[in-house]
């Protein structure tokens, strides 16, 4: 069965974004990119909430045409263009694009069914509201978090308070020169 992995940058007080949805606190330097991109590239399905998807769709398709884009940026842009995407949204229009599924009614059922299909792992990118629903349904198998050296004092929380108690096994942790700490936890089943 495929795994669902949550990848997110989180403040030390547990927020994925500030009070106005801002991500300006995230340190994403070359050292962290060297760590993150090898984790992302084998994933064959990206899972997004509407807001995160719109941010990604508004940025990554243009990177390949940007002569100033970094090597990391180009690699991720190629991955983004090729990966299957599942988006949780009640407001985005449905699409006939084969590599894009927009699900507004039963995202939990859609992800549960996708886990049973053949393929590589699936990764949730940020998307706090979606993460809350999938974690509450017991569908998140791994947590790959980068703990950012900042306290926001409020914003969009990683956890929504409805998740079932889960025992986790720490598989790895790494501290970066920037003060970011990357952790990899796997849910014990």
For each feature predicted by the language model, list its residue ranges.
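Enzymes that bind and transform nitrogen-containing heteroaromatic metabolites
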Residues: 1-189
């Amino acid at each position: 069965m495929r795994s669902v992995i949550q990848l997110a940058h989180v403040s030390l007080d547990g927020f994925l974004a500030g009070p106005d949805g801002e991500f300006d606190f995230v340190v994403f330097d070359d050292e962290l990119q060297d760590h993150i991109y090898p984790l992302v590239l084998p994933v064959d399905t990206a899972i997004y909430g509407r807001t995160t998807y719109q941010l990604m769709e508004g940025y990554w398709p243009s990177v390949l045409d940007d002569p100033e884009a970094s090597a990391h940026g180009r690699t991720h842009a190629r991955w983004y263009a090729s990966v299957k995407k599942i988006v949780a949204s009640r407001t985005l229009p449905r699409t006939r694009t084969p590599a894009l599924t927009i699900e507004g009614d039963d995202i939990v059922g859609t992800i549960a069914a996708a886990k049973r299909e053949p393929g590589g792992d699936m990764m949730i990118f940020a998307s706090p509201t979606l993460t809350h629903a999938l974690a509450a349904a017991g569908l998140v198998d791994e947590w790959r978090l980068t703990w950012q050296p900042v306290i926001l004092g409020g914003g969009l929380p990683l956890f929504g308070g409805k998740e079932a108690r889960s025992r986790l096994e720490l598989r790895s942790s790494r501290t970066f020169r920037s003060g970011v700490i990357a952790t990899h936890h796997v849910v014990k089943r």
